[in-house]
Curated annotation (Swiss-Prot):
Naturally occurring in which organism (per UniProt): Shewanella oneidensis (strain ATCC 700550 / JCM 31522 / CIP 106686 / LMG 19005 / NCIMB 14063 / MR-1)
Family: Belongs to the ribonuclease III family.
Known partners and oligomeric status: Homodimer.
UniProt cofactor(s): Mg(2+)
Protein name: Ribonuclease 3
Role noted for this protein: Digests double-stranded RNA. Involved in the processing of primary rRNA transcript to yield the immediate precursors to the large and small rRNAs (23S and 16S). Processes some mRNAs, and tRNAs when they are encoded in the rRNA operon. Processes pre-crRNA and tracrRNA of type II CRISPR loci if present in the organism.
Length: 226
C-alpha cells in the first residue's frame, strides 16, 4: 500500500483540521488496500452532502419546483462534480490503494475519487458535527451554488463549453483519447481537450471516453471563468 504523503497539507487544502486523523486516513483508504476502508464513511457522507445541498437549494430558490430542485441537486452531487472537487484537492496523491488498483491507475479513476470525497465528508461529520460540515460544504460549493439556476435540464459540461465558445464565435474544443489502460472490462481513459484560448491542453481521466471528455470540459470551463 502506498504511504499517505502529507495529511496536514491535505487538511489545509480541505479547510478543516482533524482532531482524529485516523478518520481521515480511513476516508482515504480504498477497499482494495485494507479491511478498514472508506465505504461506510462514504455512505454517511453521501447522505450528509445530499441534505446540505438540498437545504441550500431550498432556501436559495424559494420559487423553484420540486423537479427543478431535484435536478439541480443531482447536478451538484453527481459523480463527475465530485471528481472535479477531488481533483482540485489533489486527492489522488493521498489515497491508500491496493497493488492492483495502484497498477491500473486507481488514483485517477473518477469513481474512486468521487467516493473518497463523500468518505471525507462522513469523516468530518464524525470528527465534528453537522453544522461544521454544512459550513465547509457551502464553502466547497460556493461557486457552483452561485452559478446554478433552475431549468428543465441541467446541461452537461461539454454542452456548456460548446455554447460558451459559440457565444464568443470561437472554434469548438478538440477532444482526443491519448491513453487507455486496463483490461477490457475495467479500462481507464485519458482524454485531452484543447481550445484556442488556452495554451495548454486539459486532461480528463475516467472509466469511459464520454466521462473523461466531460471531466476535461468541466475543467476547461473553470479555467475560462477565472
Amino acid at each position: 500500500m502506498e504511504p499517505i504523503k502529507n495529511l496536514p497539507r491535505l487538511c489545509r487544502t480541505l479547510g478543516y483540521e482533524f482532531k482524529n486523523l485516523d478518520l481521515l486516513t480511513q476516508a482515504l483508504t480504498h477497499r482494495s488496500a485494507a479491511n478498514k476502508h472508506n465505504e461506510r464513511l462514504e455512505f454517511l457522507g453521501d447522505s450528509i452532502l445530499s441534505i446540505v445541498i438540498s437545504d441550500a437549494l431550498y432556501h436559495q430558490f424559494p420559487k423553484a419546483t420540486e423537479g427543478d430542485l431535484s435536478r439541480m441537486r443531482a447536478t451538484l452531487v453527481r459523480g463527475d462534480t465530485l471528481t472535479l472537487i477531488a481533483q482540485a484537492f489533489k486527492l489522488g496523491d493521498y489515497l491508500f490503494l491496493g497493488p492492483g488498483e495502484l497498477k491500473s491507475g486507481g488514483f485517477r479513476r473518477e469513481s474512486i475519487l468521487a467516493d473518497a470525497v463523500e468518505a471525507i465528508i462522513g469523516a468530518i461529520y464524525l470528527d465534528s458535527d453537522l453544522e461544521v460540515c454544512r459550513q465547509l460544504l457551502l464553502n466547497w460549493y460556493a461557486e457552483r451554488l452561485a452559478e446554478i439556476q433552475p431549468g428543465i435540464n441541467q446541461k452537461d459540461a461539454k454542452t456548456l463549453l460548446q455554447e460558451y465558445l459559440q457565444g464568443l464565435k470561437k472554434p469548438l474544443p478538440d477532444y482526443q483519447v491519448i491513453n487507455i489502460e486496463g483490461d477490457a472490462h475495467d479500462q481507464t481513459f485519458t482524454v485531452e481537450c484543447r481550445i484556442d484560448d488556452l495554451s495548454q491542453s486539459v486532461i480528463g481521466v475516467a472509466s469511459s471516453r464520454r466521462k473523461a471528455e466531460q471531466i476535461a470540459a468541466a475543467q476547461v470551463l473553470e479555467l475560462l471563468k477565472k
